[in-house]
């Protein structure tokens, strides 16, 4: 099987397609509200009643369980609310200081290839991190984007320590995607301690600020947009983004 690192990651739409709507939500978004919005929007995209969309949000502290989540990986079930997400993957944490990008795209207009779509999402994240001179890397045995930590002791097997900086969890229904990615800007990293993030015990989590970078959410959002257009094509910003930048 072809490794994800060898898959072509261009997911440009068919010629003549409308730009992807790009919306930045102010404040904290309740997770049930986000689920309801994504379900409705994905159905509207499938039926032709709405266009593709990327929705950037922050959530209050919570854990979500993907379809592969194991109950033993929920270490502190009473620490934060726990939601069944319906996406792929295992447990993850969302909270303030973490940018969640919900990606609602019609892959019939792009490429009907799930593995290539995951690789494209990883490339989007890697391109975003590169704007801050952070080398994000993919791993064939685990989804997400990782950074090597030469400042940390090596693992027992002698391999370099590495931390996860971004998670990916998606769902496709009749080739329309929803759910998406999460990048750690400045979340409270101790909040990840209530779970085994994504079922991976041997590696930790990090953030842009933890890596020593003075990056804010607005900085990340600009980099996200530029890197998204490289992989997925043009976007059209909604008024919410303008309000966020000037508010």
UniProtKB/Swiss-Prot annotation:
Pathway in which this enzyme or protein is active: Protein modification; protein lipoylation via endogenous pathway; protein N(6)-(lipoyl)lysine from octanoyl-[acyl-carrier-protein]: step 1/2
Name one matching Pfam family. LplA-B_cat
Annotated GO MF terms: lipoyl(octanoyl) transferase activity
Residues annotated as catalytic: 198 (acyl-thioester intermediate)
Q: What family is this protein classified in?
A: Belongs to the LipB family.
Q: What else is known?
A: In the reaction, the free carboxyl group of octanoic acid is attached via an amide linkage to the epsilon-amino group of a specific lysine residue of lipoyl domains of lipoate-dependent enzymes.
In its UniProt entry, what is this protein called?
Answer: Octanoyltransferase
- Gene name, please? lipB
């Amino acid at each position: 099987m072809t490794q994800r690192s060898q898959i072509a990651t261009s997911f440009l739409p068919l010629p003549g397609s409308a730009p992807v709507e790009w919306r930045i939500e102010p404040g904290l978004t309740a997770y049930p509200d986000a689920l309801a919005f994504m379900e409705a929007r994905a159905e509207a995209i499938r039926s032709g009643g709405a266009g593709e969309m990327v929705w950037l949000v922050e959530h209050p502290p919570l854990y979500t369980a993907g379809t592969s989540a194991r109950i033993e990986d929920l270490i502190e079930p009473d620490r934060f609310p726990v939601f069944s997400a319906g996406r792929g993957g295992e447990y993850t944490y969302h909270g303030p200081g973490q940018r969640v990008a919900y990606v609602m795209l019609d892959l019939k207009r792009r490429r009907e290839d799930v593995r290539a779509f995951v690789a494209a999402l990883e490339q989007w994240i890697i391109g975003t991190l590169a704007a801050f001179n952070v080398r994000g890397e993919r791993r064939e045995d685990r989804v997400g984007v990782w950074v090597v930590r030469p400042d940390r002791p090596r693992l027992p097997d002698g391999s370099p320590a590495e931390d996860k900086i971004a998670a990916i969890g998606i769902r496709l229904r009749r080739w329309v995607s929803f759910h998406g990615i999460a990048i750690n800007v400045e979340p409270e990293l101790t909040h990840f301690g209530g779970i085994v993030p994504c079922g991976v015990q041997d590696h930790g989590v990090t953030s842009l600020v933890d890596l020593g970078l003075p990056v804010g959410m607005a900085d990340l959002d600009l980099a996200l947009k530029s890197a998204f257009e490289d992989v997925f094509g043009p976007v059209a910003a909604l008024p919410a983004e303008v309000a966020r930048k000037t508010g």
